[in-house]
């Protein structure tokens, strides 16, 4: 073998090695950069604890499994309008959302029980109902029926009635004729009717202008939402009805959920729990502090006959077509949860 032959052989081997190495060099960075994208939609505004909570969720995942997820938070209803998220998830157009029980009841009518006024007593009762056996049954049914996996129940707040112009409100009869903004589903509108008002459907993003122009006379939301969305600027009175201790469900589509390895699923659940804890603690704290803040803004704070509201609202639900579909014994189990 000559020196020339040896050189040619060495060159041939080098070229073959390079040919095999190039695809690896190209593929390896691509694999390293591959992330699971999770797009989350919420109607909440940036200052709301729910949006802040979603960034806690994002940060917790980034810390626990660096580089594995690309969590994209779309706030203020910019991706999907309020109430459209569940269907978007089912169609594969959205990965995650904060779903209301009203959204769920539209597809599973027997769960309208969870939309009933004066059902949940307080945030602690809420956590025990949704964090216990009832919540587990709820999650299984929703996964099987809707193709959506519930990750964590999240405290929305205790809903109060706020009015653009003050009026005497002691009982539901005093809300007769009041155009009370509610989200657009029939479950929400029924609640407004049960309160004695004239429920008026309006998108959350339009509530501020609606109060300002008189399109609506009032709206119902938890106090932290009143502040974060600056609705207090067009509010003259808050009536402390406390008619709904409200929950949202941080949820993920089954399509996105089933695509995750078991280890990633565990980290997603942990991140959801930590995010919910952050939200719940801050909302409970802020609800206690905001009464004085609103008084300082010149808003009249009034306490009605809550028992009169409770009896009227509960009677309306028990006589409705909704109650006919409630699972047997579930109301008693919710009431008995301590």
What are these regions (language model features)?
Residues 1-3, 40:
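Intrinsically disordered, low-complexity segments enriched in Ser/Pro/Gly/Ala and basic residues
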């Amino acid at each position: 073998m000559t020196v020339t032959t040896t050189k040619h052989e060495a060159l041939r081997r080098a070229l073959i090695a390079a040919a095999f190495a190039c695809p690896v060099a190209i593929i390896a960075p691509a694999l390293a950069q591959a992330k699971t994208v999770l797009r989350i939609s919420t109607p909440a505004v940036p200052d709301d604890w729910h949006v802040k909570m979603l960034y806690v969720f994002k940060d917790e995942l980034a810390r626990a499994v660096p580089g594995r997820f690309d969590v994209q938070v779309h706030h203020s209803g910019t991706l999907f309008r309020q109430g459209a998220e569940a269907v978007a998830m089912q169609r594969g157009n959205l990965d995650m959302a904060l779903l209301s029980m009203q959204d769920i009841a539209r597809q599973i009518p027997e769960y309208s029980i969870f939309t009933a006024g004066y059902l949940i007593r307080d945030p602690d009762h809420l956590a025990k109902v949704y964090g216990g056996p009832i919540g587990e049954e709820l999650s299984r049914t929703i996964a099987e029926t809707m193709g959506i996996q519930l990750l964590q129940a999240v405290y929305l707040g205790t809903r109060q009635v706020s009015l653009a112009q003050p009026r005497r409100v002691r009982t539901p009869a005093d809300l007769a004729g009041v155009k009370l903004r509610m989200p657009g589903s029939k479950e929400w509108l029924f609640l407004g009717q049960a309160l004695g008002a004239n429920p008026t459907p309006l998108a959350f993003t339009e509530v501020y202008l609606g109060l300002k122009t008189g399109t609506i006379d009032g709206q119902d939301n938890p106090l932290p939402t009143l502040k974060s969305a600056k609705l207090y600027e067009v509010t003259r009175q808050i009536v402390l009805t406390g008619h709904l201790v409200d929950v949202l469900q941080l949820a993920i589509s089954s399509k996105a959920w089933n695509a995750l390895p078991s280890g990633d699923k565990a980290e997603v659940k942990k991140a959801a729990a930590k995010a919910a804890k952050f939200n719940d603690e801050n909302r409970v704290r802020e609800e206690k502090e905001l009464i004085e803040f609103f008084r300082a803004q010149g808003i009249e704070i009034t306490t009605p006959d809550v028992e009169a509201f409770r009896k009227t609202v509960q009677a309306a639900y028990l006589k409705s077509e909704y109650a006919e579909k409630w699972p047997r014994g579930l109301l008693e189990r919710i009431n008995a949860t301590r």
